[in-house]
Swiss-Prot record:
Keywords (A to Z) from UniProt: Aminopeptidase, Hydrolase, Metal-binding, Protease
Protein's name according to its UniProt entry: Methionine aminopeptidase
Function: Removes the N-terminal methionine from nascent proteins. The N-terminal methionine is often cleaved when the second residue in the primary sequence is small and uncharged (Met-Ala-, Cys, Gly, Pro, Ser, Thr, or Val). Requires deformylation of the N(alpha)-formylated initiator methionine before it can be hydrolyzed.
Gene symbol of the encoding locus: map
Keyword Hydrolase found: yes
Enzyme Commission number: 3.4.11.18
Species of origin: Mycoplasma genitalium (strain ATCC 33530 / DSM 19775 / NCTC 10195 / G37)
Family statement drawn from the similarity comment of this UniProt entry: Belongs to the peptidase M24A family. Methionine aminopeptidase type 1 subfamily.
Length: 248
């Protein structure tokens, strides 16, 4: 079921998203390098709770962490452990925030100061995809297949590979709502964007292969053959004249 949000609901969701933006601004690479993932997870939890909000992912479907911290070969859904975030690493922070029942789900990727140039280029390409190909597709009555196809075409033309098994989704009242928004698809297929939709769009991109596997903890989604990967997630509100990005 697709939940079309009222103006009051969008206002509440924006408050949750404002906390995400504060998390992203505060937790810079300089603050996090050298820390264990479990420490980073707790620091973000404390920051969110100081804003009178909760970590939405904790306990969701049994998830044991507070936030998804995906280091290096982990693409998404990483559970924080004792591993230290080092200068050569990639760390994706996927943050779920529950502010009095209004939800934000968004992610950003950080690279250490000694990250491989290929990882740097990948992150730049993923971040630029939002303004170059995603946002031009965000308008009322556009089929979601057009958005999915635009994402697929952009990344495949650059020689990248996309995670096929996971995608974006509706959000705001529940963590995962309809519609499913895959990062691949055919034009003119799927439901059409409607005014009042709040959606998460999240390219999950790899350099060498689209193959993934599940870690022994049944949470961390790992690359199987790809050396580098990147995941960025933004939330959008579809309006009568286009969109609002709620998380950037």
């Amino acid at each position: 079921m697709i939940y079309l949000k009222s103006a009051n609901e969008v206002a509440g969701i924006k408050k949750a998203c404002a906390i995400f933006k504060a998390v992203k601004a505060y937790f810079t690479i300089e603050k996090l390098l050298g820390k264990k993932l479990v420490t980073i997870d707790r620091l973000i939890k404390q920051f969110i709770e100081q804003k009178q909000a909760k970590c939405a992912f904790h306990g969701y479907l049994g998830f044991p962490g507070f936030n998804c911290l995906s280091l290096n070969q982990t693409v998404i859904h990483g559970v924080a452990d004792q591993t230290v975030f080092k200068d050569s690493d990639k760390l994706t922070l996927d943050i779920g925030i529950d502010y009095h029942g209004y939800l934000c789900d968004a992610a950003f990727t950080l690279l250490g100061n000694k990250a491989d140039p290929k990882a740097v280029k990948l992150l730049n390409d993923v971040e630029q995809a939002f303004s170059k190909v995603i946002e031009p597709e965000l308008f009322v009555n556009n089929p979601i297949g057009n958005l999915s196809n635009a994402i697929q075409t952009y990344f495949e033309n650059k020689g990248y590979f996309l995670v096929k098994e996971f995608g974006g989704h509706g959000c705001g009242i529940k963590i995962h709502e309809d519609p499913l928004i895959l990062n691949w698809g055919e034009k003119n297929q799927g439901v059409r964007l409607q005014e009042g939709m709040v959606i998460c769009i999240e390219p999950m991109v790899m350099t060498d292969s689209s193959e993934i596997t599940m870690a022994a903890n049944n949470w961390n989604v790992l690359t199987l053959k790809s050396k580098f990967n990147c995941h960025v997630e933004q939330m959008y509100h579809i309006t009568n004249n286009g969109f609002e990005c709620l998380t950037n």
